């Protein structure tokens, strides 16, 4: 028995399910999770000293790879001055200014501790600002685990095979309206039905928690127009896409300005963090400036601020995203070539340093149902066989993958060689 297996069995006696976030338990692929002890660059090493090419990247934050020297140096400098003060620091201002200079829609920003806190606060703020209660989310889009947003959510809920979760009264979710991603007509119908009651529309502009889905530009433009028409706010949940698909986020790539943007992951450089930002008049509704309350003991933690600032300074460098996009494209092309050589139906797509794939004969994947109809059994076999070859993909077909600036031609070639071997075996 491996040390990973020993640790998982031990963890199950003291931690629910043996993990502190459900997707880590490998429920989506079967088997037992791998326990890791270190990471460097594009690689992870498990507790049994096996090395893997890492395409999870801590679920997105590690765009510079593991233990980037600039991030380590920044955190180390702050660490010896104090890990937390529960009071304002200059680093908070510096990171806020950096984010606002890069994100087109952000004029003011509030730091929080997680993506869940960011989206939860964004919904509360939108309701407070508009004095309306209902909001629209999209089937399969995941916005953290706050009560009102765990309705037809993606990510871990899809991995576990449940549409929502017990413990949330209907009275909390009665104001949550849902539509299919990329379906503007459904959204228009909801606005027509509740013309004076919808406070906001929230979405991942590029969903990464129901597989990897690229939006139709007409869909995003239509949402902006509908929100303007009905005096509702548009929230882009860019916790995953922010500084991942491009230097100015998905909003910069598609030229759509939301009213509120939520961020996380990369802006903490691997440390726990979240944020929400937007128009000055909206953000000024947050306490202590306005009446909408939000607070957090560790919000603006100096270690997270330092790591995030160091990360953003690196990704600002010339050609960073051009190089990252090229590497990610090479990866998806390599996987597609390996599948084609094995005569296995396969679809892959990418944007910036974010990608996804599934085993399907569809030429495009536009929503949750397209991903759900793909071959999950084959995905599970592929995942475990690639893991055995030292390639670590997300342990769920509903999760996007991530490439870092430390991935290069060597890692892509190794991944291709492994995929060709595995897919030929699976097609035999």
UniProtKB/Swiss-Prot annotation:
Its EC number is 5.4.3.8. It catalyses: (S)-4-amino-5-oxopentanoate = 5-aminolevulinate. One of its GO terms (biological process) is protoporphyrinogen IX biosynthetic process. Its cofactor is pyridoxal 5'-phosphate. One of its GO terms (molecular function) is glutamate-1-semialdehyde 2,1-aminomutase activity. The modification N6-(pyridoxal phosphate)lysine is found at residue 265. It is found in: Cytoplasm. One of its GO terms (cellular component) is cytoplasm. Keywords: Cytoplasm, Isomerase, Porphyrin biosynthesis, Pyridoxal phosphate. Its main location: cytoplasm. The keyword Cytoplasm applies. CDD domains: OAT_like. Belongs to the class-III pyridoxal-phosphate-dependent aminotransferase family. HemL subfamily. Homodimer. PANTHER family: GLUTAMATE-1-SEMIALDEHYDE 2,1-AMINOMUTASE (PTHR43713), GLUTAMATE-1-SEMIALDEHYDE 2,1-AMINOMUTASE 1, CHLOROPLASTIC-RELATED (PTHR43713:SF3). This is Glutamate-1-semialdehyde 2,1-aminomutase. It comes from Legionella pneumophila (strain Paris).
């Amino acid at each position: 028995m491996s040390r990973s297996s020993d640790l998982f069995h031990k963890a199950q006696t003291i931690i629910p399910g043996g993990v502190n976030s459900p997707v880590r338990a490998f429920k989506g692929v079967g088997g037992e999770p791998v326990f890791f002890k270190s990471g460097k660059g594009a690689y992870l090493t498990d507790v049994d000293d096996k090395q893997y090419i890492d395409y999870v990247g801590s679920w997105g934050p590690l765009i510079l790879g593991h233990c980037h020297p600039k991030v380590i140096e920044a955190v180390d400098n702050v660490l010896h001055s104090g890990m937390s003060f529960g009071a304002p620091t200059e680093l908070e201002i510096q990171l806020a200014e950096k984010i606002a200079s890069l994100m087109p829609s952000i004029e003011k920003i509030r730091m929080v501790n997680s993506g869940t806190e960011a989206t939860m606060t964004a919904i509360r703020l939108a309701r407070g600002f508009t004095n309306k209660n209902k909001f629209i989310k999209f089937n399969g889009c995941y916005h953290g685990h706050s009560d009102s947003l765990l309705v037809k959510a993606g990510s871990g809920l899809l991995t576990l095979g449940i549409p929502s979760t017990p413990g949330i009264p209907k009275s909390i979710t009665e104001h949550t309206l849902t539509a299919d991603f990329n379906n503007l007509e459904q959204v228009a119908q909801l606005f027509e039905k509740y013309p004076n009651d919808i406070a906001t529309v929230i979405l991942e502009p590029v969903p990464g928690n129901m597989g990897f889905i690229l939006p139709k530009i007409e869909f995003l433009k239509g949402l902006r127009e509908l929100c303007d028409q009905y005096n509702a706010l548009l929230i882009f949940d860019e916790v995953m896409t922010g500084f991942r698909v491009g230097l100015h986020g998905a909003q910069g790539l598609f030229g759509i300005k939301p009213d509120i943007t939520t961020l996380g992951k990369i802006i903490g450089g691997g440390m726990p963090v979240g944020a929400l930002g937007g128009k000055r008049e909206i953000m000024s509704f947050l306490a202590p400036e306005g009446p909408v309350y939000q607070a957090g003991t560790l919000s603006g933690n100096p270690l997270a601020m330092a790591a995030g600032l160091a990360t953003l300074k690196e990704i600002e460098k010339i050609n960073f995203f051009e190089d990252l996009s090229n590497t990610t494209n090479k990866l998806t092309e390599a996987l597609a070539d390996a599948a084609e050589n094995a005569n296995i139906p396969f679809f892959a797509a990418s944007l910036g340093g974010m990608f996804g794939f599934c085993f399907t004969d569809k030429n495009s994947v536009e929503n949750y149902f397209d991903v759900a109809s793909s071959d999950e059994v084959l995905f599970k076999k592929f995942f475990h066989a690639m893991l055995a070859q030292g390639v670590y993909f997300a342990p769920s077909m509903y999760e996007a993958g991530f490439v870092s600036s430390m991935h290069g031609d060597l890692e892509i070639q190794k991944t291709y060689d492994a995929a060709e071997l595995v897919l030929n075996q699976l097609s035999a």
